[in-house]
Amino acid sequence: MGEAGIEVVENLLPSLRVELDLDLVIAQAENTTAGKGISLSDFERLRAAGVDFCTGGNHSLFLKEIHEAMADPLQPIIRPANYLSKTVGLGYKYIDTPDGPVLVISLLGQIVGRDADKPVDNPLQIIDKILKSEKSNKKVAVVVNFHGDFSSEKFVIGHYLDGKVSAVIGDHWHTPTADADILPGGTAHITDVGMCGSLDSSLGVKYSDIIPRWHDGRQTKNQLEKEGRMQFNALLVEIDPKTAKAIKVKQIRKIIAPSS
């Protein structure tokens, strides 16, 4: 979430990649640049920090400078696949790993989709079409990032895709949920993975801006918090390359105290 989130990733991810021997790092990047969209330079910063692939959400297309990269099959960044078909960019792409290719898909929930920067289709119907056209090899790992508001919707798509994909990782709340699990069909699932950025804030925004809005309805501008404690949230998923099913899942949460 904003500059604070980028700096947390830059500070922690390089050592985590080594410590955990990670094959693939996927980041939800729609709030990277000032909390809305992602610029080319910030995309490059995340890549330099160790992020292999970036998924999207309702602000993915806010900055036009990233559109060309999203439309390039060789650039590891996507927008939600259930944007209407004529929308710029791609909603799923493959990326190579030491254990073979991984298909990464980004989806937007129907509730948050009402406020998206572009119109959206039904995510369940779209994922059906994608899997039918792309998953001829059932051993290919498939990771789905689901950007949605309602926990009920996130539960539904997780269980709908159980056994069809390797992982369904929810986000959008900026707050991690304590429900990381491997579903009966072998699909890793979490309702919300959380965010990287300010901890002492309202989802990354300064309390001084948010409290007056809730207290007496004053209209205030969202300013991102850059001071205080920071947080790093992620989900570690181990996938069996022979079956493309999840065999281990673990939440990662680190709190960074402000430097004195």
Predicted regions and their residues:
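Acidic, metal/ion-coordinating pockets
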Residues: 1-260
